[in-house]
Amino acid sequence: MPVHALWSAPRSRSTAFFRSMVERGDLLALHEPLEGLHFIGPLQIDGQTFESPQELLAWLVEDTSGRSVFLKETVNPPVQGSVVDDRRFLAEARHAFLIRRPEEIAASWFALEHDMRIFDTGPRLLHDLFVAVQNAGGHPPIVIDSQDLVANPAAAMAAYCAAVELPFIADALNWQPGQHSEWARSSRWHEDAATSSGFVAPARPDRHGLATHPEVARFSERHTPFYEELCRYRLDIPSAT
């Protein structure tokens, strides 16, 4: 059955996207399992224990008991390295890339961590994975801008579902607030998703007051060319009326 992978840089609204996929009820939804295997250790999924990313990726394309899978991952060097080495997974999965303006990523990260250790990750690494998917010769990768997702959730999710051949379920655009077992190990990163009941844009664009911070500006300068390149491929989402 199909494997639907969503890749994003940190702080790009990907957990809200994941929460919507859980709400559908028709997918085996996996929250950052590759990252967990790299940084925490063996992982149990569906009654099976996986020791490595390679084991998990092989299972995803070979045997998921006939169910469709949704996999959400934040792209960092270890995760990207394990995926680009698996050309079968690159070619057979349906890949989507959720992008966000680099200055917004940086401000959101810095507000939590007070550092920019993701300086060499971000949209640059996401772009590298996008190119690897293109070169694998499988399904064309999909790009969604998170700004479109919060500006017009119904249209954005309908366009995504059409692109990856999933039925659109309007009821999955809203959910009950609360923490979720899938992201319990990293819950402090997901407070916005946990307190939300749907896709909502922040009331103030610079809610952290960091738009002019030099670290934010440096990150934005580094990653904006890669964000803009990915923007060339993003789904055309109409503005909400």
Protein language model annotation of sequence segments:
Residues 60-83:
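Glycine-rich phosphate-binding loop used to anchor ATP phosphates in small-molecule kinases
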Residues 49-56, 117-121, 189-199:
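A polyampholytic, Gly/Pro-enriched intrinsically disordered region
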Residues 2-4, 169-241:
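PAPS-dependent sulfotransferases, especially Golgi type II membrane carbohydrate sulfotransferases
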Residues 43-48, 159, 183-190:
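Short, surface-exposed amphipathic charged segments that create phosphate/polyanion-binding patches used
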